[in-house]
Amino acid sequence: MARYLDYVPTIIVVEPDSAACVMESIKIGKIKKIDIKRESLMGGMSCGEVSLVPWEILKNSVKYCISLPDDDIAKTMKLLGNSSFSDDKIIAGENSAPGVISLITSCEDQAIKEKLDLNEKSNVLVFGCEGDTDQEMYQKLINQN
């Protein structure tokens, strides 16, 4: 990737702590299957094994991995869907919220901010590839107290 870019971005993978297969695979340098003992609210990311095609890219480009519990998923979905947060509502599902949670948490921790070189001049791109695919579940989660 570096030969095509003047600046190589820092790539961070975020996944459920109960199914951190990318993190475990990066640690050992080969695909590691995770025995999922508890399903995550982040169902689409709770797969337990990295697919071969993305692994060929991830193994050489991921700089950091973050694994998260389900605790803040609903709160973050609600924050993003709050129209006072932005001009438009951001309808983020359970698999889109983790990247935002990681960014917020990283910005609140000075040591992590320094490690990631996060500052007021940073450009951050967070991928969120899911909206309210299950509208009933989405409403239930964002309306929790």
Give the residues covered by each predicted segment.
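Glycine-rich phosphate/pyrophosphate-binding loop at beta-loop-alpha junctions
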Residues: 1-60, 113-145
